Amino acid sequence: MKLIKLNKKDFKNFADKHPQITFHQTEEWANLKKVNNWQAHYVGLENDNDEIVAGAMILSKTLPIIKKKMFYSPRGFLINYNDKKLLETFTNELKKYIKKEQGIFVKIDPFVEYQEHDNDGNIVKDGYNNKSAVENLKKLGYKFFGFNLMQDTLQPRWMHVIETKNRTLDDVMKDMESKTRQILRKNERCGITTREITRDELPIFKDIMKHTSDRREFVDRPLSYYEAMWDNLHDSGILKILIAEIDFNIYEKNTIEEKEETEKSLKERIYKKDKGILKMNEKKFNSSNKQDEETIKRLEKQLEKIKELKKEYGDKEILGGILFLIYGNEVLSLHGGSHAKLMQFQSAYTIHFEGVKMAVEGNYNRYNFYGITGDFRKENPLYGLYLFKKSFGGHVVELIGEYDLIISKFWYNTYNIAFNLYHKLKNIKSSLKK
């Protein structure tokens, strides 16, 4: 077997049939990374029958001063990691290729599950696992960065997904917590809908992300990042951005209708009881009346609040948005956020539900909420994020982690010293600005 360079078409033909394919291993993703001076390499391992049995899209970037290259195969390689002989052959051939290209190491973070977990994060007894894949990589000299509970260097190691292949939307909804279904119905009554934005509306999404990053204290990307993503991923159907909007006129109309229906129900009950038509004991009769009266008062206050909201925001207002990537086996939620000013409407439920619908209707294998942590203790500051995703049903996914295949130990160690020093200085500079 030998490693060969593939043209983009041949690589796509191989990659799209591979069970581990993600948007990371596409020409479109490579083109996006070109903006930051990454160069794409498409390679495949060819057997004696001229068949490609393993492959990868690998990115390289020339390091300053030393003029050596670092390599990264995002969510690669596309190979059966449990086949040690195949992995060994591919590794040895790739080493030669990377060395020839002046590379000092190649980083991988395969889209391969380590072991099966349920919705609570528990390991499933007698469930599937790929522990041999980890052992094979370590035996072949790959530097393993450990079973991190948080995010790896570049990509999440823990995710939450809903299986959607050959399932109806009703099937999926049955697995959701009752509270989640209630919120979805409530949002519909409130006039919350979603729509896909255009490129010209990217500043709207950027504004959502800025408010979210300020609130949650993470660094957001510039508008140019989202523009580059759009330009490289949208036309091929990979990228879709949905925003949630509330229509206060619909919210008002539905509230008025609910109030009128409740008033009608109350009047009919009293009339039927007075005429002896309704057979109901006094305790139940009074309890039902009290409940309706409280509902009417609540709806009256709600109508007053809606008038205030209309005065402040107009007829409609944007609540939040999510950037979805749709490719291969799944619909994935990559970036998302919401405005704090109207958080009470919980628009994230509605937008994620639209993502679930896309996965079901497109018969994808799954809907991927993407990153969570592997720390399922209530004390974990990010536990609430996990609970939110868990409420939709599904299960936890743990990947096999991150690895470096070192080609030159000297230059690899030099790079890491320089890299760590750079980030220390950057953090000091950042802290001085505060």
List where the protein language model places each region.
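Intrinsically disordered, low-complexity, positively biased terminal segments
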Residues: N47, I66-K67, F77-N119, K125-Y128, ...
